UniProtKB/Swiss-Prot annotation:
Feature type site, description Reactive site: G4
GO MF annotation, one: endopeptidase inhibitor activity
Source organism: Mus musculus
One GO CC term, this protein: cytoplasm
Extent of motif Secondary area of contact: 46-50
Protein's name in the database: Stefin-1
Stated role: This is an intracellular thiol proteinase inhibitor.
Sequence similarity: Belongs to the cystatin family.
Pfam families with a match to the protein in the record: Cystatin (PF00031)
Length: 97
């Protein structure tokens, strides 16, 4: 993957689930919802001045959310929610947003 390019989708790992869990309170505050299910399904990464991680989340009842998480160049696991897209389906591709 080149600098700035988005990787191919990969199956979510326990590390990706941990990252999603860290930004879950930020997402729930922004959407004003509590998600009973919050399971990472797949992800893509993008190397910038740090790293963007795009994660497809299964939030239950056939609903999915795409989240964009940023980790700064310090590499200190300072994850921040930088965007999200609601009303997604399992079949929708994760894309840059």
């Amino acid at each position: 993957m080149s600098l700035g390019g988005v990787s191919e989708a990969s199956r979510a790992t326990p590390e990706i689930q941990m990252i999603a869990n860290k930004v879950r309170p930020q997402l729930e505050a922004k959407t004003n919802k509590k998600y009973e299910k919050f399971e990472a399904v797949e992800y893509k990464t993008q190397v910038v001045a740090g790293e963007n991680i795009f994660i497809k989340m299964d939030v239950g009842h056939g609903c999915f959310i795409h989240i964009k998480v940023f980790n700064g160049p310090t590499g200190k696991d300072n994850y921040e929610l930088h965007g999200y897209q609601t009303d997604k389906t399992m079949d929708e591709e994760l894309t840059y947003f």
